[in-house]
């Protein structure tokens, strides 16, 4: 996975490292990265949609997630998670994220998540709503209605 240009991300969120995130090797355990990415996605969707996520009515689920690690995160570093939507298809969209050290800009990892529109009543995939498509478009400032890249 290539390292994207950090300037292409509008959404940034500080990550609070916890002592328990660190393993016996002295760095943040790789499984914790997904917690950081999940928090970044939750805040991103809140900003994109203009409201907090309704946990009683989930309208998207993860179909695939892939993470590439480039450098370890160590306790005491100032880490931020950058998040953006890369593409919107008919029933799915792609979220691109990056963890990096704020002071040096060193990229720690990059994550790509494919999310699918979901109806919790039927438990089936559904098309991405026009409203969500418009919200991504407006937030990301796309000229192409399906995203960039």
Model segments located where?
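Short histidine-centered beta-strand/loop micro-motifs
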Residues: 24-27, 71-72, 77
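Catalytic strand-loop segment that frames the active site of acyl-thioester-processing enzymes
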Residues: 1-43
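HotDog/MaoC-like acyl-thioester-processing domains
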Residues: 1-13, 69, 73-75, 86-149
């Amino acid at each position: 996975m290539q390292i994207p240009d950090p300037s292409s991300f509008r959404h940034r969120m500080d990550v609070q490292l916890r002592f328990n995130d660190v393993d016996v090797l002295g760095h943040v355990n790789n499984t914790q990265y997904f917690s950081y990415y999940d928090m970044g996605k939750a805040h991103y969707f809140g900003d994109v949609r203009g409201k907090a996520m309704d946990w009683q009515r989930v309208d998207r689920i993860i179909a695939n997630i892939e993470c590439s690690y480039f450098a370890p995160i160590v306790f005491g570093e100032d880490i931020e998670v950058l998040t953006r939507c890369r593409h919107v298809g008919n029933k799915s969209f792609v979220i691109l994220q990056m963890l990096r050290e704020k002071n040096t800009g060193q990229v720690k990892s990059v994550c790509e998540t494919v999310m699918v529109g979901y109806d919790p009543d039927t438990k089936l995939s559904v098309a991405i709503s026009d409203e969500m498509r418009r919200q991504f478009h407006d937030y990301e400032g796309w000229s192409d209605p399906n995203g960039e890249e």
